[in-house]
């Protein structure tokens, strides 16, 4: 697909402006294709933790999440007991929601069951976009959907596999963040740079 015309004014996606942490995340991470199983698992857990809150809240707490959730290693999280859950729910450095903490543990167990047969988590997730990022051509934030048929399919498959906090809207936000779709506006320099540097088909 064509890039924005050379005369088109270029500026970052409006949602990242006015908050330094958002801007750094937008410029360095959001929309960059992720293929690493552990990184994808981490992102899925954090997207679920964000439900009903702002992503800024999660970004502010992400480093602490990584510390108390053992680097988001599924094998470790799957073994969490009630004492660990109680410690997490008493920790102001994370989002203290019992259902979300329980979902992280359940999702770790579902991750292990899903990958036990040899399929990678990455391959399982990327199948919903045919293994390659979808490069969209949005000109305004208003045009970007909250969910798509691809996120609907991912959500249904994850739920069948036992995952929690994986509704279609959460899955689409996950797909945007993990680079399964390039939803930077065409007026954003990252739209073309991600395409160039990560070899979209």
Regions found by a protein language model. Give the residues of each.
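HhH-family (HhH-GPD) DNA N-glycosylase catalytic core used in base-excision repair
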Residues: 1-201
């Amino acid at each position: 697909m064509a890039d924005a015309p050379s005369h088109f004014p270029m500026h970052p996606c409006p949602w990242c402006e006015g908050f330094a942490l958002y801007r750094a995340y937008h410029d360095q991470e959001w929309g960059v294709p992720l293929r690493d199983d552990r990184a994808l698992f981490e992102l899925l857990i954090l997207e679920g933790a964000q439900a009903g809150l702002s992503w800024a809240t999660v970004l502010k707490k992400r480093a602490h999440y990584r510390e108390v959730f053992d680097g988001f290693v599924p094998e470790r999280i799957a073994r969490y007991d009630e004492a660990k859950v109680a410690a997490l729910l008493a920790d102001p450095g994370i989002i203290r929601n019992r259902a979300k903490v329980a979902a992280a543990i359940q999702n770790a167990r579902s991750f292990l069951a899903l990958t036990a047969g040899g399929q990678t988590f990455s391959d399982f997730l990327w199948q919903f976009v045919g293994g390659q990022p979808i490069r969209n051509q949005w000109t305004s934030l208003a045009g970007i959907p909250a969910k798509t048929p691809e996120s609907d399919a991912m959500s249904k498959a994850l739920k069948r596999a036992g995952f929690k906090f994986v509704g279609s809207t959460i899955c689409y936000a996950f797909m945007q963040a993990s680079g399964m779709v390039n939803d930077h506006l065409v007026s954003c320099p990252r739209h073309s740079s991600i395409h160039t540097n990560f070899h979209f088909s």
